[in-house]
């Protein structure tokens, strides 16, 4: 089951793909031809209804001529550790 955070991530990634594609003047069908991914599958990704594999995101990014991270970025310049990571830390056990 997909939780709310995952739904938001999928919707955000889809939005960035759609905005990048549209900004480059590409139709969904044109991107489909460039990636080898069907237009209906791309539509599901763009609307956040399908969870694309990393290799699929790479194909889309390559076709759009952007780094794959661009499609995953949330607009912030820095990555902040989550509250649980900083308060609980990590148990490295035998790796220390």
Please annotate each region the language model reported.
Residues 1-23:
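A short, Lys/Arg-rich alpha-helix, primarily the initiator
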Residues 2, 73-96:
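Short, charged recognition helix plus adjacent turn
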Residues 33, 44, 73:
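Phosphate-coordinating loops and pocket residues in cytosolic domains that bind phosphorylated ligands
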Residues 36, 55-70:
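DNA major-groove recognition helix of helix-turn-helix/homeodomain DNA-binding modules
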Residues 36-51:
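Recognition helix of helix-turn-helix/homeodomain-like DNA-binding domains
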């Amino acid at each position: 089951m997909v939780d709310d955070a995952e739904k938001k991530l999928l919707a955000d990634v889809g939005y960035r793909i759609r905005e990048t594609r549209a900004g480059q003047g590409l139709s969904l069908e044109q991107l489909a031809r460039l990636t080898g991914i069907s237009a209906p599958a791309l539509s599901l990704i763009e609307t956040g209804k399908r969870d694309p594999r990393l290799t699929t995101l790479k194909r889309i990014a390559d076709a759009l001529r952007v780094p794959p991270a661009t499609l995953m970025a949330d607009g912030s310049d820095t990555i902040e550790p989550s509250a649980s990571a900083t308060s609980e830390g990590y148990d490295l056990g035998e790796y220390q």
